[in-house]
Amino acid sequence: MTTQAAEVAKRRTFAIISHPDAGKTTITEKLLLMGKAIAVAGTVKSRKSDRHATSDWMEMEKQRGISITTSVMQFPYREHMINLLDTPGHEDFSEDTYRTLTAVDSALMVLDGGKGVEPRTIALMEVCRLRDTPIVSFINKLDRDIRDPIELLDEIEAVLKIKAAPITWPIGCYKDFKGVYHLADDKIIVYVPGHGHERIETKIIDKLDSDEARAHLGDLYDNFVEQLELVQGACHTFDKDAFLKGEMTPVFFGTALGNFGVDQVLDCIVDWAPQPLSRATHERNVEPTEEKFSGFVFKIQANMDPKHRDRIAFMRICSGKYEKGMKMRHVRLGKDVKIADALTFFSSEREQLEEAYAGDIIGLHNHGTIQIGDTFSEGENFGFTGIPHFAPELFRRVRLKDPLKSKQLRQGLQELAEEGATQVFFPERNNDIILGAVGVLQFDVVASRLKEEYKVECAYEAINVWSARWIECDDEKKLKEFQDKAFENLSVDGGGHLTYLAPTRVNLSLMEERWPDIRFRATREHH
């Protein structure tokens, strides 16, 4: 095996998806602890004080205690290199989250054992399904009261349309939580409370049918054996092929806060989750073991460092090897650039990078030339596909408090739109500026960032827009005719694309009927 093939085989790149408050930030910290990445995992409760969770860093996040921006963390574990992408857990950030899911090879779904499958999880799973991403499931919070585990598995199957195969099974919960039983290995992994901040040797009892197991389970033993027979009769047995096709999810139980069960999840990702996979471009499929470098930008983030007013473009490497100082082609601009200062991410610590391989996420300093969806290669002119924009669902008109700052406002919005924080539309018929977002919180984020980073204060006004559709048409004459007739509702987005802003659902249906040659697109590939 070549060095490069060996490096690719070591990589596991995955994202965590969950509903807010299911324990995602805690599990992120515990995973880093597994990789000895943070000596002491700061509990999330200390957020209100000075010690903020390492993966939540922007000012507004510190106030609200939510991870708005996607952060990337790399750490070693069992001779593998783990790339963990933390996705925004808050209701509103599905566009950013969506694109993060385009950059991973598998995902870890975290469910709150007391609540089961929640709306945000459903939305994220739909995104994973678009690419048949393999999903590992972790049912969290067993140190509290949880719902019946069989019910939880049924719900995963019914609501998320994926087969659930339990790998471990909980023994009791809340005050009676004794640990989990590993179905295939016939062993009990004993829960010892109070070790949330440190790694401890796990105590294991071999064989459920043993005196030691009976002593540990006490009064719970007979009931547990009975329940287990039911589980083994009714539940799916794990099938790795079905998992890799995105049809089945292995399910683990534990408590992230108690640092229990997280290591089994990480072992599963190392043992079963795919190494970096091939990626589609407009021209051909690119294999991770190819010698020549290639990658795509899936996210741009401003001001990761309050000390530097910089923007960082996050790039997923798809093939080859990054070496410090190498030349690569920025395909959209047709320009060759020398990259000497790419970054690797260790939570909020940033380090200069010497080399990186397929599956790794690297950060490029962006001075306004890099956009989401950009492809970089070692000379070849192709573009990676599957990194869409989504039609926003909410719209506001922007009103400037100081009319003299309109230049700063436009610059700020242009940069925030390139970064994917919002979408901006300029109507053809007047000088309004309209913002589009997938969730309300995005508007707050944009206003607070305009104020902090661009010294511009703005207010929002309601506007009569139901949804946006990108316009495509092969017939120039028809397009011109459409533009004349639909002038009142046409805008140009931040990327210069013609967009129809429909005032109502009925209006959009009528327009689609009336103009069969015009394509009204709800998503737009980044070009």
From Swiss-Prot:
CDD domains tied to this protein: RF3, RF3_II, RF3_III
UniProt record, GO biological process: regulation of translational termination
UniProt-listed PROSITE patterns: G_TR_1, G_TR_2
Location in the cell: Cytoplasm
PANTHER family: PEPTIDE CHAIN RELEASE FACTOR RF3
Keyword Oxidoreductase: no
Family matches, as InterPro entries: EF-G-like_DII, EFG_III/V, G_TR_CS, P-loop_NTPase, PrfC, RF3_C, RF3_dom_3_sf, RF3_GTP-bd
Residues where GTP binds: 18-25, 86-90, 140-143
The protein, known as: Peptide chain release factor 3
Domain tr-type G, residue spans: 9-277
A family per Pfam: GTP_EFTU
Family label: Belongs to the TRAFAC class translation factor GTPase superfamily. Classic translation factor GTPase family. PrfC subfamily.
UniProt keyword annotations, A-Z: Cytoplasm, GTP-binding, Nucleotide-binding, Protein biosynthesis
Lineage top rank: taxon: Bacteria
Function: Increases the formation of ribosomal termination complexes and stimulates activities of RF-1 and RF-2. It binds guanine nucleotides and has strong preference for UGA stop codons. It may interact directly with the ribosome. The stimulation of RF-1 and RF-2 is significantly reduced by GTP and GDP, but not by GMP.
Keyword flag Cytoplasm: yes
